[in-house]
Amino acid sequence: MPSQDKEIDKIFLIGAGGFLGAVCRFLLCELVEGQLGILSVNVIGSFMLGMIMYDTEYLGFIGPKGKIAFGTGFMGAFTTFSTFAVQSFSLPFIPALGNISANIFLTLTGVFFGRSVIKALSSREI
């Protein structure tokens, strides 16, 4: 039973994080509408997830439960690849290419900067 309790704890952490992530995404997309809203969500999310993933490896500030709650739950609900894909598909060809390029470049840049913040804080080479 202890193993089953740990799984239930993980599911609860993911669900609670997911709830908060979905609410935050909704609020940000209300503030910044359309493709720019989804781009903002995905770039911010990539930056934060980059920090979370590298923190758990190099600083250890967040810990395993935080990684589950924030990395899997919150970020999983906050970011949205599927909405980005649907929006891109619904645009004319040239604007779609711009949206796709911006999302890919800026989200990878977000991860890079999230990693860089953790690298600077840890003073260790990644």
UniProtKB/Swiss-Prot annotation:
Na(+) binds at G76, T79. One of its GO terms (biological process) is cellular detoxification of fluoride. It catalyses: fluoride(in) = fluoride(out). Keywords: Cell membrane, Ion channel, Ion transport, Membrane, Metal-binding, Sodium, Transmembrane, Transmembrane helix, Transport. It is found in: Cell membrane. Na(+) is not transported, but it plays an essential structural role and its presence is essential for fluoride channel function. InterPro entries: FluC (IPR003691). Its main location: membrane. One of its GO terms (cellular component) is plasma membrane. It is a multi-pass membrane protein. GO terms for molecular function: fluoride channel activity; fluoride transmembrane transporter activity; metal ion binding. The keyword Transmembrane applies. The chain crosses the membrane at residues 11-31, 34-54, 66-86, 93-113. Belongs to the fluoride channel Fluc/FEX (TC 1.A.43) family. Fluoride-specific ion channel. Important for reducing fluoride concentration in the cell, thus reducing its toxicity. This is Fluoride-specific ion channel FluC 2. The gene is fluC2.
